[in-house]
Amino acid sequence: MNAASTNNGPKIQLIGEVLEDAGLISEAQLQTALFDQQIYSDLKFGEILTLRGWIRQPTADFFAKYAKQELILIDSKRLGDYLLEADLLTTEQLALILDEQRLNHMLFGSLAVLKGYIPQKTLNFFLRRILNQHVGDRRFWQTTHHPKTSLAQQPNAKATQPPLSKETLNTAKETDPTEINWIG
């Protein structure tokens, strides 16, 4: 038996691979930092990235803990908490996202990406690896239940449009409720 097959423990990743997977550094930056590490062997990989200005030191520390599996993942922690801890969001940015989220009911991560605070690849990394969620099963917004009442049930309400035809109703049933038809 070889050593790889006897080691059943969790795989420890290299911080550079984790940062690249999270979309925080490119392949070229990874290769450059690896070259620098050969010259400056007294520096840690995250310190090299920080000195080059590619990431901040708290971000390097967060991902170093994750790579070494020393990061404590807590079920009650939310995405924003982890992004703050990783120094990828400021408290001001967090507050802006939460304020906007109350208005338009979009998901926190979607707003962080749309506002340009984090790349989509970073959001996917946090959802998949940190929060252990499937990336493809989330929508950009949260739906909230609003009780619907017909115009007939509302006092003093008048219908302003003619009733929908049977053809329109059948077409509406066939479309995906999450699809947005911009034209037509």
From Swiss-Prot:
Span list, region Disordered: 146-177
Xref: InterPro entries: T2SS_E_N_sf (IPR037257)
Compositional bias of kind Polar residues: 150-172
Highest taxon above the source species: Bacteria
Protein name: Uncharacterized protein SYNPCC7002_A1588
